[in-house]
């Protein structure tokens, strides 16, 4: 498998090639794209990973609050809305060690990169 292989790009390339090869035959064409991202394994092309590097270093609680504030400023949600608390089974950010925080931030970066890459490929 090529070093830069990413399933969403491969599926999209294959679908585009099939559409192009059937474009002129005048027959109906059905396509079903069943992407596997953003499920395990968590991986994404480097360009997408680079885009999210450091974005989640503040932790999930702080990011949730920033997103809520931005939505309130845009009048998307009520000004009295509050960030939902983290479920008890999930550790609070400030209770994690620095290495655990770094790992969680990295997982969120990769997940965001996968969703972004998937969205890009669907748009092609």
Model-derived features: positions:
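Active-site-proximal cap/lid insertion segments
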Residues: 1-124
């Amino acid at each position: 498998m090529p070093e830069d292989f990413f399933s969403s790009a491969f599926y999209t390339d294959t679908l585009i090639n099939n559409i192009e090869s059937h474009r002129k035959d005048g027959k109906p064409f059905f396509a079903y794209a069943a992407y596997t991202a953003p499920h395990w394994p968590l991986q994404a092309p480097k360009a997408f990973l680079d885009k999210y590097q450091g974005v989640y270093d503040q932790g999930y609680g702080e990011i949730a609050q920033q997103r809520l504030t931005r939505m309130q400023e845009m009048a998307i949600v009520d000004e009295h809305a509050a960030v939902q608390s983290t479920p008890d089974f999930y550790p609070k950010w400030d209770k994690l060690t620095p290495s655990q925080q770094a790992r969680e931030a990295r997982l969120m970066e990769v997940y965001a990169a996968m969703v972004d890459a998937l969205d890009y490929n669907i748009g092609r």
